[in-house]
A protein has these predicted regions:
Chain A
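Short, Lys/Arg-rich, polar N-terminal cytosolic tail immediately upstream
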Residues: 1-30
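A structural signal for multi-pass alpha-helical bundles of membrane permease subunits
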Residues: 31-314
Length: 314, 274
């Protein structure tokens, strides 16, 4: 799927699977003991902090619990609560808005920019740094920066509005503007990684395809759309999954720091709503239900995407 | 003649769009040296009239050296633990044939679809039950335990080493630990570098887990100190000082990124599968 994976992975697969040599190998007890010893440290931490929480999350959704008292089994009551909780449905809408507004522009812009800087010209290697550099910013650092950019009194956008004699707009406190403003920052933050992944994907497109297309008289846009884009489909799939997860789950950091879910819940996505239910309302069971819902959404979107891409590639 | 003109057009597009993308960050650097009147000036200035280094002194005392040390300790511990657990595990899964290896491999695939923010609440529950909330172990261990990407990446790498190399060492009488340590590990340097850079960056920038697990003065990391500046910088301190604090928090990652850029892009491309 990626440079490392395919270059090395493909070779490795060819070398061993189901060769006669392998069938002859018997499991040796001494080997097994060594293997488990080498695995043990990773397994212990992984089971305690990933596998058990996953199971706990599913289990707790059937309990009423406040972190401290004994959990009380309530069956499907938490799920029933979800059905009538309009705030939860609003936050589900916010989550979907994050995904809808964020994912496609991130992919489209990232792809175009990667194609642009995938040029074999002297000096481009250095110029690429300009495109990669936002990757070093944490959400916290970029929040400090973008909160200033969006600030109505001191920020550049406010200044621009004043030039045209327009009234100041407090972007992050306007319910229709806050979410798009956060999404713009998230796109900016996500671009370096998307560009890097696409650059890796573009390296694997064989040069002679382009030569053939040029011979057939295809212009640059036609080449881009009919040759380059289909040839990086596997990268697009990976990028899409990463970005869906990014906008469903990582919007939590962004809205927690920049808008605290406001104004009027306009940026309270499911992730933040679940967070509040757990850590402000101490309703751990219900928060677990909301986490399960997010899990289902991610799996459903990815499954749907896979189904669509399969249909189109056949 | 035509290709030359096209080339110039492409160069200028690359430079122009690159500057647009990097602009907010360049402005952050420039703004961190502006005086209050510079940054509030209208129309906005691109460069400070005279650099005010005092901003950094103020930002430094706002952030406190303790917080900076905490961040290094947190990131360093996460990185060392991850390397110490993921490398041997990846080796065992790729080179040793034993019953159960497929099950273990499958187990490490589970979290590939589970973003860590979704496991936040149950991870907090488990860490709380272990009595680790509020201290350094609770901060580090759950993040270090996110080992699946590392294990899968190293497994992938070790499986590209020729079996003959491993067999030769085994026939010479080296046990698995020695084979791992003196044959496989030195060859893994490039992939270790790539994984380390990505892990360093990710851990340095974490916000929510440190907020939940260890928000106290003694254990607080840089992102926790910075976040309030995004909403209160305009009342408490000058935006320039906020910018300076952001720059201080950014410098270590920026250095790592610039020095190890090659490894970083390889690391992203390599872990991108997950």
């Amino acid at each position: 799927m990626t440079v490392l994976e395919t270059k090395r992975g493909a070779g490795a697969e060819r070398r061993h699977p189901r060769s006669p040599l392998r069938k002859k190998t018997k499991y040796r007890k001494a080997d097994a003991a060594s293997a488990w010893l080498l695995l043990a440290p990773a397994l212990v931490l992984f089971i305690v902090f990933i596998i058990i929480p996953t199971i706990v999350s599913l289990g707790l959704s059937f309990y009423q619990w406040d972190f401290f008292d004994t959990p009380a089994f309530v069956g499907f009551a938490n799920f029933a609560k979800l059905a009538t909780d309009s705030a939860a449905w609003n936050s589900l809408g916010v989550t979907l808005l994050f995904v809808l507004l964020g994912v496609i522009p991130t992919i489209a812009i990232g792809f175009m920019l990667a194609v642009l800087i995938n040029a074999n010209m002297p000096g481009v290697g250095v110029l690429r740094v300009l495109y990669f550099v936002p990757v070093v910013l944490s959400v916290a650092v970029s929040a400090v920066l973008w909160a200033f950019i969006y600030d109505s009194r001191q920020g550049p956008i406010g200044a621009l509005l004043r030039v045209f004699g327009l009234p100041p707009v407090d972007i992050l406190n306007t319910d229709t503007l806050a979410l798009p403003a956060l999404v713009i920052m998230m796109i900016w933050l996500a671009l370096p990684i998307v560009i890097i992944l696409y650059l890796a994907g573009l390296q694997r497109v064989p040069e002679d395809i382009y030569a053939a297309a040029a011979l057939d008289g295809a212009g640059p846009w036609r080449t881009l759309w009919s040759i380059t884009w289909p040839n990086v489909a596997s990268t697009t799939f990976v990028v899409a999954i990463l970005q869906i997860v990014n906008y469903v789950a990582s919007s939590l950091d962004v809205s927690l720091i920049m808008t605290n879910g406001g104004p009027l819940g306009a940026t309270t996505a499911l992730s933040l709503y679940a967070y509040r239910q757990a850590f402000s309302n101490q309703d751990v069971g219900y928060a677990s239900v909301l986490s399960v819902v997010q899990m289902v959404i991610i799996v459903a979107i990815i499954g749907l995407g896979r189904l669509i891409t399969r249909r189109f590639s056949r | 003649m035509r290709p030359a003109r096209l080339r110039i057009g492409r160069y200028s597009t690359i430079i122009l769009l690159g500057l647009i993308i990097a602009f907010p960050m360049l402005y952050l650097l420039s703004g961190s040296l502006m005086s209050f009147s510079d940054i509030a000036q209208y129309p906005p200035r691109l460069f400070p009239t005279t650099p005010i280094w005092e901003n950094f002194a103020q930002a430094w005392s706002y952030l406190t050296p303790r917080t900076i040390l905490n961040t290094f300790a947190f990131v360093g511990s996460v990185l060392l633990i991850q390397l110490a657990i993921c490398l041997p595990a990846g080796f065992a899964l790729s080179k040793i044939k034993f019953r159960g290896s497929k099950v273990v491999f499958g187990l490490f695939l589970v979290p590939v679809l589970l973003p860590t923010n979704l496991l936040l609440i149950p991870t907090f529950v488990v860490t709380l039950q272990l009595g680790l909330i509020g201290n350094f172990f609770g901060l580090v261990l759950p993040i270090a335990g996110q080992a699946s990407v590392g294990v899968l990446l190293f497994r992938q790498f070790f499986s590209t080493l020729p079996d003959g190399l491993i067999d030769a060492a085994r026939i010479d009488g080296a046990n698995w630990f020695r084979t791992f340590y003196s044959i496989a590990l030195p060859l893994a340097r490039p992939i270790i570098a790539a994984y380390s850079v990505v892990t360093f960056l990710t851990a340095w920038n974490l916000y929510i887990w440190p907020l939940l697990a260890a928000p106290g003065e003694q254990t607080r990391v840089l992102t926790l100190a910075l976040a309030p500046l995004a909403t209160t910088q305009f009342s408490n301190i000058s935006p320039s000082v906020g910018f300076a604090a952001a720059v201080i928090a950014m410098v270590p990652v920026l250095v790592v990124f610039v020095v190890f850029q090659k490894w970083f892009t390889r690391g992203i491309a390599g872990t991108g599968l997950e």
